[in-house]
């Protein structure tokens, strides 16, 4: 079935020669195309499994939903690569240039998307442990708790290495070298930042410079900057070193030069940048909390349209790793925006007279309550416009509430109902306020959508 859909999709997208590159995120298939006029959008939207389509940053994006898109992607890529062509195969890179801010955010998003399953699994496990402790399902010190704790913490311990691997691949470099550089920056001999209150890092004296033996566990910006520089060094060496020596010489020089630069120059600088970003966000949260919650809750769904919301993971990881913060106060806001989309979708389901729209609206709304919003956003609310505005209103109200009562989480990557597992560890009050915010966001979006109404096409 997926193979047939892939063949039709490729044909309706203008054929092999109209496609420059193919990529995907957790719910969407993305085509970078030469000529948008060759795409039969209406026919694609009528394909089995397609929940909606849209253009963003020059990419034609098709929503299939989580668990399906990766299967479709494999078949589409196989058909695309094996189909006959009168033109040479193009490099799989996006052809359109984005402005620097958009390009940076998109790159962050593309780096973190492949890591989401690991983050989600660990986040749910951490939440499960929190629930076990809150409800006393196991005795304190139980070997089961210790075992689950080991399993749940692994992804976050290895997160810098996973990011280094993914970033190197995104930058067109050797991903294993990226993992090595990330491993260097989280080496056990380097002091974990969380220990700063009780320990002082030793230092290396080189050429009059005092280099602190400080690790960067949980700090994403130093990892990203180091791997980016590494990719440039590796590419430069590939243009100089003879091919007969590149297997040995290029990795050796790349790791040695990047490692020294990372410890001496880049990471201290990147760490300062990360601290400034974190302190700025904390300042905004402390001094413009409710207004900031309303603003971020209102606009978050608009950011989701581009898929760039995944770029926030780097910021959230930094907040959790910071010993002076240690919690994630952003993800409750994102969650309010997501469940608001579900509330708006339920209003559409209740009000529409179209049977085809009802069939989409109800399951897509329920999916939004589970934290996956693309089906309801692109399949229903955005097409009708006003429900999307209603959801933004609900997200703003819910976002303001969770900031006002200071709802926090101990992980990221989860919203909606699954997020309960990562708010429970902070106590019953945190959980109750989260659920109140959940209801406020969903109900206010529902009411706002009913009030605004929407115009639908006749069947």
Swiss-Prot record:
UniProt-listed SUPFAM superfamilies: Glucose permease domain IIB (SSF55604)
Domain PTS EIIB type-1: from-to ranges: 1-86
Group of enzyme by EC: transferase
Annotated membrane topology: Multi-pass membrane protein
Keywords: Cell membrane, Kinase, Membrane, Phosphotransferase system, Sugar transport, Transferase, Transmembrane, Transmembrane helix, Transport
Its biological purpose: The phosphoenolpyruvate-dependent sugar phosphotransferase system (sugar PTS), a major carbohydrate active -transport system, catalyzes the phosphorylation of incoming sugar substrates concomitantly with their translocation across the cell membrane. This system may be involved in sucrose transport. The EIIB domain is mainly phosphorylated by the EIIA domains of GamP and PtsA/YpqE. Negatively regulates SacY activity by catalyzing its phosphorylation on 'His-99'.
NCBIfam families in the record: PTS-II-BC-sucr
Name used for this protein in its record: Probable PTS system sucrose-specific EIIBC component
UniProt organism field: Bacillus subtilis (strain 168)
Gene that this polypeptide is encoded by: sacX
């Amino acid at each position: 079935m997926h193979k047939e859909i892939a063949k039709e999709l490729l044909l309706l997208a203008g054929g092999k020669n109209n496609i420059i590159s193919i990529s995907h995120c957790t719910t969407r298939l993305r085509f970078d195309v030469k000529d948008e006029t060759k795409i039969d959008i209406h026919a694609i939207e009528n394909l089995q499994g397609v929940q909606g389509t849209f253009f963003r940053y020059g990419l034609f994006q098709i929503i299939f939903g989580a668990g399906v898109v990766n299967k479709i992607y494999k078949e589409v890529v196989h058909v695309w690569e094996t189909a006959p062509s009168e033109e040479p195969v193009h490099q799989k890179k996006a052809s359109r240039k984005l402005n620097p801010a958009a390009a940076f955010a998109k790159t962050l998003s593309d780096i973190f998307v492949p890591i989401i399953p690991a983050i989600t699994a660990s986040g749910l496990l951490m939440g499960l442990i929190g629930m076990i402790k809150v409800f006393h399902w196991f005795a304190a010190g139980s070997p089961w708790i210790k075992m689950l704790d080991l399993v749940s913490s692994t992804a976050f311990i290895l997160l810098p290495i996973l990011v280094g691997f993914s970033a190197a691949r995104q930058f067109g470099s050797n991903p294993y070298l990226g993992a090595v550089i990330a491993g260097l920056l989280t080496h056990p001999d380097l002091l974990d930042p969380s220990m700063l209150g009780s320990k002082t890092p030793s230092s290396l004296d080189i050429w009059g410079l005092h280099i602190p033996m400080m690790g960067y566990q949980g700090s994403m910006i130093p990892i990203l900057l180091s791997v980016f520089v590494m990719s440039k060094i590796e590419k430069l060496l590939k243009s100089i070193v003879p091919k007969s020596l590149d297997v040995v010489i290029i990795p050796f020089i790349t790791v040695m030069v990047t490692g020294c630069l990372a410890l001496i120059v880049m990471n201290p600088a990147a760490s300062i940048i990360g601290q400034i970003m974190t302190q700025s966000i904390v300042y905004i949260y402390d001094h413009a909390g409710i207004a900031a919650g309303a603003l971020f809750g209102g606009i978050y769904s608009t950011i989701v349209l581009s898929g760039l919301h995944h770029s926030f993971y780097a910021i959230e990881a930094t907040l959790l790793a910071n010993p002076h913060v240690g919690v994630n106060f952003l993800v409750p806001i994102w969650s309010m925006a997501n469940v608001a989309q579900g509330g708006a979708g339920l209003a559409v389901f209740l009000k529409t007279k179209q049977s085809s729209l009802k069939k989409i609206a109800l399951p897509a709304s329920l999916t939004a309550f589970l934290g996956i919003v693309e089906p309801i956003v692109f399949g229903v609310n955005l097409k009708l416009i006003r429900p999307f505005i209603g959801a933004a209103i609900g997200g703003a109200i819910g976002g303001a509430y969770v900031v006002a009562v200071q709802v926090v989480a101990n992980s990221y990557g989860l919203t909606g109902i699954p997020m309960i597992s990562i708010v429970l560890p902070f106590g019953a009050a945190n959980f109750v306020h989260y659920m109140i915010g959940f209801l406020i966001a969903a109900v206010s979006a529902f009411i706002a959508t009913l009030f605004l109404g929407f115009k639908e096409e006749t069947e």
